[in-house]
């Protein structure tokens, strides 16, 4: 008989969970408190009210009680449930607040959720799936993955994680890595621009008017500080912007208010393993100027936080509270305005 997950979780103490998967899979990952043995071994042990869990494709004796969806079903349920329950305040509420406060989704939008395979974009996909089920504003979603030339095992990891999390991905191929591997200068900058161009182009080809990227709160404040320290200017990563090269297309960042540490907590709680940077250049190079600057900025923020716990939020809020009368100059629509222009003697 099939025992539904909700019933099991509600009445855990009534069952003894028997995991019949192979030993290697069990040792790699299992439900706490479960016993690894075969159905026959469980019968020999005369375990009271055993509930069997295996692979979703396993065929069970009709006389056995087995968990709906198998081990994969349990992992999916736990990952989805933890977004709206255990980490509701840290993830779900921050996501919906960003969508609302920054007006990221409008009626009848068709959004391409761009998945790189990392923790941020995978979580974003699950948040969109949850929002799509409950939103009062009608919108459509495509979950797209651009393969810039990943090694086979990296591509497989993305596909396996999408299957495990029940994300209906669409994969399209490019050879961006081959192009940037041959560049001597600024490969990361060029790679990022090429990626975005391909994402915009593919999204538009399937009828989307927006692409969603997985940049989070920490990305935004690091970018703010980097622009000052390394670029000699004041600007930040906005929660949305219109494309300059693809008319009618817009980029949105729904994770804008979510802290990276909370994404990591969700990932680790669910024992998920996502793709890290799989760039050929990063793997082959001893130094990466763009990445090292971001890392240095991240360390600086961490150091400042030791004496000022509010430093991260203060950096974030500084971009909402710019006093134009108290700056030497600023640009608006490519026109430079200097403080002396309106200074009266």
Region locations from a protein language model:
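Catalytic subdomain that performs nucleotidyl-dependent activation
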Residues: 140-141, 219-300
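Catalytic cysteine-centered active loop of the rhodanese-like fold, especially the PTP/DSP P-loop
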Residues: 37-71
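The feature marks non-catalytic terminal segments
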Residues: 272-345
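Flexible, polar/low-complexity N-terminal or interdomain linker segments that lie immediately upstream
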Residues: 1-28, 72, 76-86
């Amino acid at each position: 008989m099939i025992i539904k997950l909700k019933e099991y979780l509600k009445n855990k103490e009534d069952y003894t969970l028997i995991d019949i998967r192979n030993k290697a899979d069990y040792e790699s990952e299992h439900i706490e408190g479960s016993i690894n043995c075969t159905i026959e071994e469980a019968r020999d042990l005369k375990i009271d009210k055993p509930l069997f869990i295996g692979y979703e494709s396993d065929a069970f004796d009709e006389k056995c009680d087995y968990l709906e969806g198998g081990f994969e079903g349990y992992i999916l349920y736990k990952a989805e449930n933890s977004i709206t329950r255990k980490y509701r305040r840290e993830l779900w509420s921050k996501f919906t607040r960003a969508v609302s406060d920054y007006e990221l989704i409008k009626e009848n939008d068709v959004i391409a959720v761009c998945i790189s395979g990392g923790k941020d974009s995978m979580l974003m996909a699950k948040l969109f799936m949850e929002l799509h089920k409950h939103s009062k504003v009608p919108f459509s979603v495509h979950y797209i993955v651009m393969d810039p030339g990943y090694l086979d095992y990296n591509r497989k990891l993305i596909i396996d994680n999408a299957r495990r999390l029940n994300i209906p991905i669409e994969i399209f191929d490019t050879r961006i890595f081959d192009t940037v591997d041959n560049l001597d200068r600024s490969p990361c900058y060029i790679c990022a621009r090429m990626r975005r161009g391909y994402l915009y182009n593919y999204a538009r080809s399937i009828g989307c008017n927006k692409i969603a990227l997985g940049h989070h709160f920490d990305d935004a404040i690091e970018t703010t500080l980097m622009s000052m320290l390394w670029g000699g200017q004041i600007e930040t990563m906005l929660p949305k912007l219109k494309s300059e090269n693809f008319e009618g297309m817009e980029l949105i960042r729904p994770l804008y208010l979510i802290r990276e540490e909370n994404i990591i907590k969700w990932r680790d709680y669910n024992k998920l393993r996502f793709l890290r940077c799989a760039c050929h250049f990063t793997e082959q190079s001893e130094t990466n100027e763009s990445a090292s600057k971001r890392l240095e900025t991240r360390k600086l923020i961490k150091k400042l936080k030791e004496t000022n716990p509010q430093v991260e939020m203060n950096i974030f809020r500084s971009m909402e509270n710019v006093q134009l009368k108290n700056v030497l100059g600023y640009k608006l629509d490519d026109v430079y305005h200097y403080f002396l222009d309106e200074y009266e003697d």
